[in-house]
Amino acid sequence: MFGVLQKPHVLVLGLGESGLAMARWCGLNGCRVRVADTREAPANLVFLQAELTTAQFMGGQFTENLLDDIGLVAISPGLSPLEPNTRALLEAAQARSIPVWGEIELFAQAIGYLEATSGYAPRVLAITGTNGKTTTTALTGRLIERAGKTVGVAGNISPSALDKLSACIASATLPDVWVLELSSFQLEYTFSLAPHAATVLNVTQDHLDWHGSMEAYAAAKARIFGPAEKGCLQVLNRQDPLTMNMARRGTTLVTFGTDLPETPGSYGVLREGGMPWLVLAEPDTEADAEQKPRRRKKDDVAADAVVPVRHKRLMPADALHIRGMHNATNAMAALALCRAIDLPLNALLHGLREYRGEPHRVEWVATIDEVEYFDDSKGTNVGATVAALSGLDKHVVLIAGGEGKGQDFSPLVAPVAQYARAVVLIGKDAGALREALGATGKPLIDAGSLEEAVEKSASLAEAGDVVLLSPACASLDMFRNYVHRAQVFRGAVEELALSRGIMP
């Protein structure tokens, strides 16, 4: 279960969901476990003490003596390697030649062990990206089920990968396919995971406080494809330069985007008669045999020339229940991953039509006086809000603001100028948003609460418009979390409906 290590004494750093899962897993597999957390009494301590009575817990600042008699460090994804206390401990571990793994590395080692000892060889699909990970992961899992395979969906989406694997082993229900949603934090300490196919949906500014730079953030995302010699099929967004830079020569590459695909096996959008269609590029066997190959463009860097293609219509984009072209790209990525493991296309297309989306991700809430209200509370960074504005393709009254995490808000300027009727600002970084969006010429209105923001948005919106909560910011300045923020928004929309004599 632990590679060349034989039931090592494990130091688990951090006792969040992943930390508890790693402690459980290591204890279950015969390891001595020491758990350290900078908090003296983390919430999960009661579960650790109840489930793993032999585990040693040490609270407070990390010190080098935590490493005494340790053979493996298992680090939680919430701990940045740049934080001074954590960095000092990791450097000390390196000096002692103690390996440092994350939860997904433990999962990968376990899958390798199961294959070697019992022949269990599941297909593994992996998904990351700044935005759209959870929707794409959940959708991929649904499509696999629709195609008649058993599937384990885990990782950043919850449950943790190790908890899910433990449950499957205990119940003798190991799945045919694993679908893993992976954050950049999880990938930082993942080394041997070798998915059959993986995607990076997009890379925009986020988590720079954890990684230190965009280059480091993108490099962590690129780890999802595993060791180059394993030949992971890459599914990349051809309209995102940072993801296309991850393409490897000699590796099968499938791309997706909202433009027309130019290489066989890639996905895109064909607009015909005002209707957008999801399409698949196929070799055009009827093309003129004398036609000279064209130089390959940005959607496939693995070869020098392209063959002629025709575009097979798969389904109208409007047939998707999930709204917006950004969700159409998520759907294409999920479809590409499933086709990479040879699942039948017709079953997958039926699954796409049935999927209704995940909560708080451009989720329809109500229509009041011909104005639609959408909850995108999970839009906690600029890239998510840009995608939501562009994807809805309507006049929008945007509710934005919160804890900005030091982001650059300037990428919002163009979509706000194009789509917004007005922006209602809330939260700690409302001033920074106002400064960034001043050049748009759009009305910028302050609100002291989310309830007030809904009232003001309703007065600004016109028939056919959308009121969109897509904050581009974290929620912790005003709310417990993004779910609480969504609940307050939905409650305010319901009150608005009742005040106008409409049953929500």
From Swiss-Prot:
It is found in: Cytoplasm. The gene is murD. This is UDP-N-acetylmuramoylalanine--D-glutamate ligase. Belongs to the MurCDEF family. GO terms for cellular component: cytoplasm. It comes from the Bacteria. It comes from Cupriavidus metallidurans (strain ATCC 43123 / DSM 2839 / NBRC 102507 / CH34). It catalyses: UDP-N-acetyl-alpha-D-muramoyl-L-alanine + D-glutamate + ATP = UDP-N-acetyl-alpha-D-muramoyl-L-alanyl-D-glutamate + ADP + phosphate + H(+). Keywords: ATP-binding, Cell cycle, Cell division, Cell shape, Cell wall biogenesis/degradation, Cytoplasm, Ligase, Nucleotide-binding, Peptidoglycan synthesis. Its main location: cytoplasm. GO terms for biological process: cell division; cell wall organization; peptidoglycan biosynthetic process; regulation of cell shape.
